[in-house]
């Protein structure tokens, strides 16, 4: 973190704390890992604010987030190595699973899982992957469930690979091994 000083005299909040530095990686809900490309002042609807300009990794998508709303929209730092251990424990643990939602309609499960992916909570994403993995052992997955599973896996793999400084293929193999041995 660093403080911004004096750059925008007259705004009254020049000393606001900026949590993300240009060039650093962060996580934006539902999009996954992003890189902070710039911090720019923009006037929108007559209000001047500072924005993070975020580029989604492995995508052409650019997102602008007001700095003062960054926390409320769920922009967060990439997970730590100790949090990776917690994610792997979630993926391994099959005994605590409340029924993997197999008895619910596909639409209800899909909405529930989508909401968890959009939350930006990496542990919820891990639960979604684990639940769908268990569900696929009991029945054939629908196309939508397969898409949700792929999205959850992708979000986990990208963030863990950044946190561990490993190639995505290595992390995918780690997660596949955990899911295969947890069945």
Q: What feature does the model see in each segment?
A:
Residues 1-12, 172:
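Protein maturation boundaries and topogenic segments
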Residues 5, 23, 31, 48, ...:
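Generic signature of intrinsically disordered, low-complexity segments enriched in small/polar residues
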Residues 68-183:
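Charge/polar-rich, low-complexity and marginally structured segments
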Residues 7-8, 18, 139:
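Generic secretory/membrane-interface signal
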Residues 13-75:
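A positional/architectural concept
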């Amino acid at each position: 973190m660093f403080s911004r000083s004096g750059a925008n005299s007259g705004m009254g909040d020049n000393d606001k704390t900026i949590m993300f530095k240009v060039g650093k990686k962060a996580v934006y809900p539902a999009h996954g890992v992003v890189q902070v490309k710039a911090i720019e002042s923009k006037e929108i609807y007559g209000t001047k604010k500072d924005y993070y300009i975020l580029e989604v990794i492995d995508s052409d998508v650019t997102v602008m987030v007001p700095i003062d709303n960054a926390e409320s929209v769920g922009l967060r730092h990439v997970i730590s190595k100790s949090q990776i251990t917690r994610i792997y424990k979630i993926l391994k643990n099959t005994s605590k699973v409340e029924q993997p939602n197999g008895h619910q309609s596909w639409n209800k499960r899909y909405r529930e899982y989508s909401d968890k992916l959009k939350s930006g909570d990496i542990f919820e994403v891990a639960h979604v992957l684990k639940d769908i993995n268990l569900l696929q052992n009991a029945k054939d997955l629908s196309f939508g469930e397969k898409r949700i599973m792929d999205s959850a896996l992708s979000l986990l793999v990208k963030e863990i690979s950044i946190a561990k400084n490993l190639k995505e293929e290595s992390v995918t193999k780690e997660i596949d091994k955990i899911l295969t041995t947890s069945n």
